[in-house]
């Protein structure tokens, strides 16, 4: 039986962390051996861990290099979300996808044509493209579309995860602007899980393994989203993109797929040892 050391749960006052996603991945790791896994925030020193521990490092939206403590000799593999843009020389450090936060209940069972919202956005306000999106949304107030959007100040102060999942489940087009610093944010994989058509930053690190075959539509200027009207005028195109989005999610983000990927990475390390 695998051992999990979870330093995330209860750490954040808003209660949002990736524990459920990581635990679901670990359930799908089958190497024929038992392993120790540790969940940690990127800038927090690890607790005492046994040799070969597999560490999930999160919350480093600045894409920084791992801190020395996360590269200690007892770390077998370091799975790093927000992978450093310049790469990492330590072969134990692997790029890892953002998944979904605990209690996110969104799903892709509703066909695009039956969804009640043409487009939606709900998230924290920042000046990394979201200010332009805010302006565009305000101009679209009377556009005749069914929509729901809102901005709030500070991270983690918006909708509860279950309500947020419900919002994305009934959304056709999910607006996924950059996070505070990074072009990556959890909204992207969460909306993909719901089969939304994704409008995303044009500088996503699509060279990383988990973006292989990514069907999101890249946006350069968040103040000019004429693509929204083009998509809404072509329901078949939207459904086709939705289908490809679900396939990508199931192949690259779903815990079963990521668990299988991680199983192979662990086996490779064992063979090299």
What is the predicted role of each segment?
Residues 230, 237-251:
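A short, well-ordered alpha-helix in the C-terminal region of glycosyltransferases
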Residues 113, 156, 233, 240-241:
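Alpha-helical protein-protein interaction elements
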Residues 220-237:
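C-terminal "capping" alpha-helix adjacent to the active site of nucleotide-linked donor transferases
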Residues 1-217, 251-272:
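Nucleotide-sugar donor-binding catalytic core of glycosyltransferases
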Residues 169-171, 224, 245:
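Generic signal for short, ordered secondary-structure residues
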């Amino acid at each position: 039986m695998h051992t999990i050391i979870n330093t995330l749960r209860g750490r954040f006052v808003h209660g949002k962390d990736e524990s459920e996603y990581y635990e679901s991945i670990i359930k799908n790791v089958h190497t024929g051996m038992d392993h120790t896994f540790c969940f940690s925030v990127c800038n927090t020193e690890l607790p005492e861990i046994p040799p070969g521990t597999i560490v999930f490092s999160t919350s480093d939206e600045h894409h920084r290099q791992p801190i020395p403590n996360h590269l200690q000799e007892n770390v077998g593999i370091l799975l790093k979300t927000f992978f450093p843009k310049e790469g990492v020389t330590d072969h134990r450090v692997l790029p890892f996808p953002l998944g979904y936060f605990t209690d996110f209940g969104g799903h892709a069972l509703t066909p695009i044509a039956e969804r009640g919202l043409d487009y939606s956005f709900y998230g924290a306000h920042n000046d990394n493209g979201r200010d332009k999106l805010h302006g565009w949304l305000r101009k679209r107030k009377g556009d005749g579309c069914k929509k729901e959007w809102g901005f709030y100040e500070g991270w983690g102060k918006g909708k509860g995860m279950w309500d947020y999942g419900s919002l994305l489940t009934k959304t056709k087009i999910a607006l996924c602007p950059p996070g505070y610093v990074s072009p990556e944010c959890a909204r992207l994989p969460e909306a993909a899980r719901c089969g939304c058509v994704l409008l995303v930053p044009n500088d996503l690190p699509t060279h990383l393994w988990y973006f292989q075959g990514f069907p999101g539509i890249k946006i350069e200027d968040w103040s000019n989203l004429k693509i929204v009207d083009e998509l809404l005028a072509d329901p078949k195109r939207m459904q086709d993109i939705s289908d490809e989005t679900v396939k990508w999610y199931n192949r690259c983000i779903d815990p079963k797929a990521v668990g299988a990927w991680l199983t192979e990475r662990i086996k490779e390390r064992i063979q090299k040892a």
